[in-house]
Amino acid sequence: MKPQLIDIGTSTKKSIQIKVVEQKYLMAPFHFHDMCELVYIQKSYGKRIVGDHVGNFKEGDLVLMGPNLPHIWLNDNSFRHPRSKKMVQAVVVYFSPDLLINLSDDESVTAIVGALIVRSQRGLWIYGKARDIIIGKMDTLANGKGLKKLIAFLGILDVLSDSNEFQYLASIGFKNSYSEKDTNRLNEVYQYLNKNFTQKVSLQEVSKIANMSSSAFCRFFK
């Protein structure tokens, strides 16, 4: 299955959408959309794929993803067990790049916001003091009203634009250029990793799942 293009909705493209997630496990497919997405994991763990990055995520993680960046968050299989009492809690903020660009006519502001959008196209894992400040403001976004929400959102943008407390996730120059054949392979590998989350998985195993040699598989993920 190739990454799906998801339409977040026209009304959202002119505003900010806040989604509070409380469910048994994460269910969104490998997908992308034309919005920026800020994800705060309050309670959950597993593996995430952002572009060509594959890594673990845990409680407290904060990630900014730019427009058209394929991504998926996969919970440990134990979350899906019928008797599991585990729950996912997260806050997700969607906002349009156009909304950011149109915030001000000041060229210096536009340049700063533009630079943030460019950085976000590789996915940013945010840590340190920047993370703590943003998480506090996301609480206001989720629970506040009116002008307080707008002020909190602008505060988040200010921190994201000014801070160096982040790590890139996807590699330099990554572009969403998956072919259907490539994405079928990726999906097979992702599903296998999800089912065998607690096991040590060898390169030979995942290469076989992708129907590739080990060396070809390594080149494929470069």
What residue ranges belong to the model's regions?
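Short, flexible helix-adjacent loops and helix caps
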Residues: S78, G146, F197-T198
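An amphipathic alpha-helical interaction segment
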Residues: D106-S177
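A general secondary-structure signal for short beta-strands and their flanking turns/coil
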Residues: H33-M35, V88, F153
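Residue-level recognition of the GNAT/N-acetyltransferase active site
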Residues: G51, S96, N194
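Basic/polar phosphate-binding segments, predominantly the helix-turn-helix DNA-binding elements
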Residues: F166-D182, E188-K222
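A hydrophobic/aromatic-rich effector-binding and dimerization subdomain
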Residues: K2-S11, P67-G136
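Generic protein-terminus/edge-of-domain signal
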Residues: M1-L64, L69-I72, D76
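Short, solvent-exposed loop/helix junctions and linker helices
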Residues: F32, L150, S179-T183
